[in-house]
Amino acid sequence: MIKKEKNLFDLLSEKPWDQEQSAQDNLHSGKTINLTKAHLGLRGIMTVSIIFFSLFIVTYADRMLLHDWQKMPEPKLLWFNTFVLFLSSILFHRAKNRSDLQEFKEVKNLLLIIGFFAIIFFIGQSIAWKQLMEQGYFFNSNIANSYFYLFTTLHVLHLFGGLFFLKRITQNIFDRNSKLLTMQSGVKLCGIYWHFLFLVWLVLFGLMINS
């Protein structure tokens, strides 16, 4: 029996809970969605984060048009932090490729370096906050300052969560009893999240230095 191809309208109008629909699905020749709980969880986290940051960006863009907006100086250290995230993203891309080749000895070293870079970013961000406060730019002194501290703090919290999962993945790789697919999937997913955080930082950083 020749299986039927489904178009977009068919997919949107189908009723998978109906018995007749179930019989029709058996004739479907397309690929089914096969995502692990980790994949679905990551997609959920990224979706919520995108919505969350987008709402703040919209309010930021509206608020900066008012007369009481006072632009604050951007610490030069933020450029260094951006470079650190850029290097981390490159290293994660290499770690993913080495993981696919099952070269986990190099993957271990790369993940340790990435974790070290994350700590460097945290330290750099703390120093940047300290420099601004020493100059009198406190959280509640101006609305622009409030948004800066809010954006950077939210990003740090997201990166801290990424560092937690990076720690778990690194432990799995050092554990010789871990399954191959588990290790490869962990490196891939954590890498995707790291790239996502880098892109979010670029958007936030670009917005802050141009407003």
Predicted regions and their residues:
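...captures the hydrophobic TM-helix bundle architecture rather than a specific catalytic motif
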Residues: 1-211
